[in-house]
Amino acid sequence: MSEADRAFAASWWLVDGLVRAGLEHACVSPGSRSTPVALALWRHPAVKVHVHLDERSSAFFALGIAKASGRPVAVVTTSGTAAAELLPAIVEAWMSRTTLVALTADRPPELRGVGANQTIDQPGIFGSFVHVSIDAPVPGDAPDEERWREL
């Protein structure tokens, strides 16, 4: 299985797990690192995808959908400072007890802290304004379906 196929498989299982937990909408700000997740969301029949070029606007749009629907909404960004653009909406969601699921792509761990393009210290970026923060592993040679669905 190619690296791209492994990334898509893991992303599909992640998205399917989120759908099983009530996800119906996702707001995507396209970027190369988040492509597997964006494609999985786009191809999932239960998810309505909203594309926004600006990450901050996308996050607030997602917050509006989540508040209106009472259901979790995903917001997807690529790596680096794109993830930081979500913080204002994440704080608003936290304060209003509204569920946003931030899916922020990142560089592989070996590219962190070495000056790689679009790389910041992403794990834990939202601090105390989230219930859970997971630094998902790079999908291995045989991604574990159940593990990715449970993330």
Segments from the language model and where they lie:
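N-terminal alpha/beta PP-like core and its mobile active-site loop of ThDP/TPP-dependent enzymes
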Residues: 1-151
